[in-house]
UniProtKB/Swiss-Prot annotation:
GO terms for MF: ATP binding; protein serine/threonine kinase activity
Subcellular location field: Mitochondrion
Record-listed ATP binding positions: L154, G155, A156, A157, S158, L159, A160, Q161, V162, K176
Name of the gene encoding the protein in the UniProt record: adck1
Protein name: AarF domain-containing protein kinase 1
One Pfam match: ABC1
Amino acid sequence: MVRGIIRIASLASVSLSSSGFFLYGTGYWDPSDFGVVRIGRAVLTTAAITWDYFTKLRHVEAGTEEYENIKSQVHLRSAHRLLDLCCFNRGTFIKVGQHLAALEYLVPPEYTKTLSVLHSQAPCTPFTDVVQVIREDLGKEISEVFEEFEKTPLGAASLAQVHRAVLQDGRKVAVKVQHPKVQAQSSRDILIMEVLLHVVKKIFPQFEFMWLIEEAKKNLPLELDFQNEGRNAEKMSSIVSSFSFLRIPRIYWELSTKRVLVMEYMEGGQVNDREYMKRNQIDVNKVSHALGKLYSEMIFVHGFVHCDPHPGNVLVRQNPENCAPEIILLDHGLYQVLTESFRLDYCSLWQALIAADKERIRIYSQRLGAGELYPLFACMLTARSWESVNRGIYENTVSKEEIHEIRSNAATYLPEISQLLASVPRQMLLLLKTNDLLRGIETSLGTHSSSSAFFYMSRCCVRALARHRKEKADSLWSYIHISLSETFCLGQLQMYEIALRLQSCIGRWINHVLLWLYLQ
């Protein structure tokens, strides 16, 4: 057990160190700009965490109250060490820390709570550097562009920070300014990461992490181009314009460059802030349902997916006109465009998962690169045990025992998970990350995927597959037949959902009657 914990802690730290390739340096002297300092800090952190687990737990009997108390204390100390490492090395270390903080169904709470500050409270760039970036990119002083400009940022992330400002005409805006030391270091950092990954492979031969650098090479230039982010925001706004609950800030192109993005200012609370929702009378179930609906549409119908929905990028507020919850989607730098063949196979796989069709789960998992590890792949996609997948994930809710089982088994299957990540299409990697972040939000809200979410997901899959078949139809009769089949399937789903709701209502009514009779 101790070895397993040490292994997990070591891998967490090593993964952070091997992911640390967004380093800062443009001529400003900063100790954290030097690779040897960053690597040394990561190695020391890994060693300290490993030694802490080993020395504190090896002489304590596993499963006892004393063991659990000591383990919790070590978790907390280790989490603070990881937080310090993220803040010192910045860049992707912060990105990885944000991701860990969202994995509340998998990572111990001591880690998620400690690292959650990275969602919006990452280390900030000094205001003088912010002024310099705006001066260089816009060719003007801040006072020439803005009537007001708050020196303290609203939030800071791995690549940039956001300030509230007011334009000369009185419009309130949010100004996203890239950290000045990101661009110049990126190429050298990727090289450093390659070296670190080879070292990791020497230590853990069974693990394959080279997909990390492949994704970095592809995504880093896109995330560093804020004009690309602006285009993504406008495209997403157009694609899901029918969703009245979604708000995406307007981009002010005349004031935006590759390093500066000026957009409409929108207020809201973070999507995982239950206290904020309680104060503002926002229904957490409606928020969770809307978020699931939005991402089902993105993934299955359009194949254009916002892949960084950590809580700092998803805000909620109440519509003052109808009191309905609204979702504000921020940070559109990281998107995954799914190929048609991948998207259709993914649709078919989720239909099989929802229907608990084991044979089709095997077929479509293997088509997506899972091979004989398809049961593990299904568990990773659903965050459910294989037993629950076989029973039907929409028919049985996740229990505390199942969550504990998943957490306990995660370490056991780390080599297989690594093998799986190395074999699936690159498109799948960001989808898995997105799924993890969304489930982390669900866990924070206490709203694990409901049957209604699965019904909407099923409808999206039916629509997507039918649209593809209609595009390939070679006759009018074939087109009509596909359309009728689509309508019939959607009608079946609607009737089944209504039946389940009625069953639920009747069950609650019977419970109330029985309780009333008991109290008489």
